[in-house]
UniProtKB/Swiss-Prot annotation:
PANTHER family: 30S RIBOSOMAL PROTEIN S14 (PTHR19836), SMALL RIBOSOMAL SUBUNIT PROTEIN US14M (PTHR19836:SF19). Belongs to the universal ribosomal protein uS14 family. Binds 16S rRNA, required for the assembly of 30S particles and may also be responsible for determining the conformation of the 16S rRNA at the A site. Keywords: Ribonucleoprotein, Ribosomal protein, RNA-binding, rRNA-binding. The keyword Cytoplasm does not apply. GO terms for biological process: translation. This is Small ribosomal subunit protein uS14.
Length: 101
């Protein structure tokens, strides 16, 4: 199990990313606009750097819904490989069965 503080930190990152999404997209559009002046583009870079670090979506980490485990996360189920295996062995995931060949 992940520490509660790590789970809370991840929730905070998601909230910050949602809050600053529009502003971040606006600044990135200015930066990538070739018709904008160099001064405007540089000012946009500086403003982007002043935004909170955790407001960047790339700082988010997928975590298991049950345990908070950050590694071996399966997007299809929203769980770590360990919890997917446990649920599959109990027959709780429809259509999923153990491979045999």
């Amino acid at each position: 199990m992940a520490k509660q503080s790590m789970k809370a930190r991840e929730v905070k990152r998601v909230a910050l990313a949602d809050k600053y999404f529009a502003k971040r997209a606006e600044l990135k559009a200015i930066i990538s606009d070739v018709n904008a002046t160099d001064e405007d583009r540089w000012n946009a870079v500086l403003k982007l750097q002043t935004l909170p670090r955790d407001s960047s979506p790339s700082r988010q980490r997928n975590r298991c819904r049950q345990t908070g485990r950050p590694h071996a996360f399966l997007r299809k189920f929203g769980l770590s490989r360990i919890k997917v295996r446990e649920a599959a062995m109990r027959g709780e995931i429809p259509g999923l069965k153990k491979a045999s060949w």
